[in-house]
Amino acid sequence: MDQKFDTIVIGFGKAGKTLAAKLAKQGEKVALIEKDARMYGGTCINVGCIPSKRLVMEAERAPAHDFEVQSEYYHVAVQEKKKLTTALRMANYNKLIDAGVQVINGTASFLDGKTIGVKGAHGTMQTLSASKLIINT
């Protein structure tokens, strides 16, 4: 069944999530498509700037002991980085849900100028249409 929206945003990065939330708060029916739930919030939050800077900060704090101590410290630092990215990812997701955006997991492909096909993780297909389609990848 074809789901109808005013706007469909493809990609959950900084610009896409911000625009989707703003449009939804203005009363538009908005869908945001992201192929991987582990990338909610985009590259910066999940694998770019923020986790990299967190690991650099932890490396600067690391005790200058033997390899075994440093190895354990590294393990803890990576776990803390994962906690941070998970918390940020969920905060971004919740902001969109609270704004009224429908978040859809899957890979988007254009079927025509106003229609998107979304293939889910288990091979399911959805068809979405909107007058405005925004690529944010």
Predicted regions and their residues:
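N-terminal Rossmann-fold NAD(P) dinucleotide-binding loop
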Residues: G16-K17
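The conserved SAM/SAH-binding core of class I Rossmann-like methyltransferase domains
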Residues: I10, I33-E34
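Beta1/beta-strand and adjacent pyrophosphate-binding region of the FAD-binding site
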Residues: M1-G13
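Glycine-rich flavin
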Residues: D2-F5, K22-E28, E34-T137
